[in-house]
């Protein structure tokens, strides 16, 4: 998870200016920065609006900052828009506050939660330790059910530390297994990112050439390679029983399964790769799929490869949604 919150939570937030700077939490994942600005401009003149995105993957982290010209408009925005329902989210609007060391690195990763626990249940469980800035429960993209994994960002690192001390190894109600509570890892510090940077961002590394790896770095099943070329449409769930399905868009016409294997293999166990081809030409139609067995490995692959330049193409990499791509 990116530390964008700490980096941006207090731009120009000193003295009276602090009463004009707002933090907006629980934004819909697909909301753009322009839409954020437009929404808050309905209250008064907005000096700046910033949607916070993951520094590696580029996707929205679900919160942003709006700085008004006047404190009066900022107050009106809180009174008017706090609690507003947007799509499936209820946004939270409040004053931002100055950044300091005590609020950095306060983001937790929780796994092993009962699948019946909702986002509200998780917040209720952890709220005793302090103010929760935002939270997210990961869900199966097909069923909408919890995957038993959540992220919680506290107001202060000390609050997060207390939560770890109290709940790591704890069995919550309805669970027969203890949960894991730890600080969320920053993808920028992950060794896989460094590996891929060395592997693909070197001047000599471009699409089409062989890549030499140690064999043990790949846990790939050749039986999983799907050479079907006649699909006009596919509908692969983001998480099927076989693993997590990743969608790769903007591949070149000459892309094949081998390049997907080479790109995703360093991140973990790949069980299936598929390039979607034109029925007549057998050329890649511009997209493909990779299935990985482990969520964290799949998420790291996405965080590292989304926006990666392959030849003259900039790839878009994300978890597969339910929508069919034709």
Swiss-Prot record:
Tissue specificity of this protein: Ubiquitous. Detected in brain, liver, thymus and muscle.
GO process annotations (BP): 3'-UTR-mediated mRNA stabilization; cell population proliferation; lncRNA-mediated post-transcriptional gene silencing; mRNA destabilization; mRNA stabilization; negative regulation of miRNA-mediated gene silencing; positive regulation of autophagosome size; positive regulation of autophagy
Disulphide bridges: none
Modified sites of kind Asymmetric dimethylarginine: 217
Glycyl lysine isopeptide (Lys-Gly) (interchain with G-Cter in SUMO2) crosslink, residue number(s): 191
GO terms for cellular component: cytoplasm; cytoplasmic stress granule; cytoplasmic vesicle; cytosol; endoplasmic reticulum; glutamatergic synapse; membrane; nucleoplasm
Post-translation changes: Phosphorylated by MAPKAPK2. Phosphorylated by PRKCD.
GO MF annotations in UniProt: double-stranded RNA binding; lncRNA binding; miRNA binding; mRNA 3'-UTR AU-rich region binding; mRNA 3'-UTR binding; mRNA binding; protein homodimerization activity; protein kinase binding
Residue positions, PTM N-acetylserine: 2
Compartments in which it is found: Cytoplasm; Nucleus; Cytoplasm, Stress granule; Cytoplasm, P-body
Residues found modified as Phosphoserine: 2, 100, 158, 197, 202, 221, 318
Modified-residue entries (Omega-N-methylarginine), positions: 206, 217
Residue ranges constituting the RRM domain according to the UniProt record: 20-98, 106-186, 244-322
Listed Pfam families: RRM_1
InterPro entries hit by this protein: ELAD_HU_SF, Hud_Sxl_RNA, HuR_RRM2, Nucleotide-bd_a/b_plait_sf, RBD_domain_sf, RRM_dom
Keywords, alphabetical: Acetylation, Cytoplasm, Isopeptide bond, Methylation, Nucleus, Phosphoprotein, Repeat, RNA-binding, Ubl conjugation
Domain notes: The first RRM (RNA recognition motif) domain is essential for binding to AU-rich elements.
Matches recorded under NCBIfam families: ELAV_HUD_SF
Role played: RNA-binding protein that binds to the 3'-UTR region of mRNAs and increases their stability. Involved in embryonic stem cell (ESC) differentiation: preferentially binds mRNAs that are not methylated by N6-methyladenosine (m6A), stabilizing them, promoting ESC differentiation. Has also been shown to be capable of binding to m6A-containing mRNAs and contributes to MYC stability by binding to m6A-containing MYC mRNAs. Binds to poly-U elements and AU-rich elements (AREs) in the 3'-UTR of target mRNAs. Binds avidly to the AU-rich element in FOS and IL3/interleukin-3 mRNAs.
PANTHER family documented for this protein: EUKARYOTIC TRANSLATION INITIATION FACTOR 3 SUBUNIT G
SUBUNIT field: Monomer and homodimer (in vitro). Interacts with ANP32A. Interacts with ZNF385A; the interaction is indirect and mRNA-dependent and may regulate p53/TP53 expression. Identified in a mRNP complex, at least composed of DHX9, DDX3X, ELAVL1, HNRNPU, IGF2BP1, ILF3, PABPC1, PCBP2, PTBP2, STAU1, STAU2, SYNCRIP and YBX1. Interacts with AGO1 and AGO2. Interacts with IGF2BP1; the interaction is enhanced by SEPIN14P20 peptide RBPR. Interacts with IGF2BP2 and IGF2BP3. Interacts with HNRNPL. Interacts with DHX36; this interaction occurs in a RNA-dependent manner.
Assigned protein family: Belongs to the RRM elav family.
Name used for this protein in its record: ELAV-like protein 1
Organism, as annotated: Homo sapiens (Human)
């Amino acid at each position: 998870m990116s530390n964008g919150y700490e980096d941006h939570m207090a731009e120009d937030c000193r003295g009276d200016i602090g009463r004009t700077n707002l933090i907006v939490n629980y934004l819909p994942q697909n909301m753009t920065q322009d839409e954020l600005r437009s929404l808050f401009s309905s209250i008064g003149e907005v000096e700046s609006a910033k949607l916070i995105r993951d520094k590696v993957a580029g996707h929205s982290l679900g919160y942003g900052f709006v700085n008004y010209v006047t404190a009066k408009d900022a107050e009106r925005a809180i009174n008017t828009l706090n609690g507003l329902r947007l799509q499936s989210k209820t946004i939270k609007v409040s004053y931002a506050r100055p950044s300091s060391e005590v609020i950095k690195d306060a983001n937790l990763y929780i796994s092993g939660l009962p699948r019946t626990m909702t986002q509200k249940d998780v917040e209720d469980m952890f709220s005793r330790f302090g103010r929760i800035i935002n939270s997210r429960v990961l869900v199966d993209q097909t069923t909408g059910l919890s995957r038993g994994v959540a992220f919680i960002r506290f107001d202060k690192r000390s609050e997060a530390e207390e939560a770890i001390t109290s709940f790591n190894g704890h069995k919550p109600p309805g669970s027969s297994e203890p949960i894991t509570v730890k600080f969320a890892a920053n993808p920028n510090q992950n060794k896989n990112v460094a590996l891929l940077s060395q592997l693909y961002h070197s001047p000599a590394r471009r699409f089409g050439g062989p890549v030499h790896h140690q064999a043990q770095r790949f846990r790939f099943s050749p039986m999983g390679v799907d050479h079907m070329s006649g699909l006009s449409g596919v509908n692969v769930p983001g998480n099927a029983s076989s693993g997590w399905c990743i969608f790769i868009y903007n591949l070149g016409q000459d892309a094949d399964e081998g390049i997907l294997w080479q790109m995703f293999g360093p991140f973990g166990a790949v069980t299936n790769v598929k390039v979607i081809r034109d029925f007549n030409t057998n050329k890649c139609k511009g997209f493909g799929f990779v299935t990985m067995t482990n969520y964290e490995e799949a998420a790291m692959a996405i965080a590292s490869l989304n926006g990666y330049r392959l030849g003259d193409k900039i790839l878009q990499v994300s978890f597969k949604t339910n929508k069919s791509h034709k």
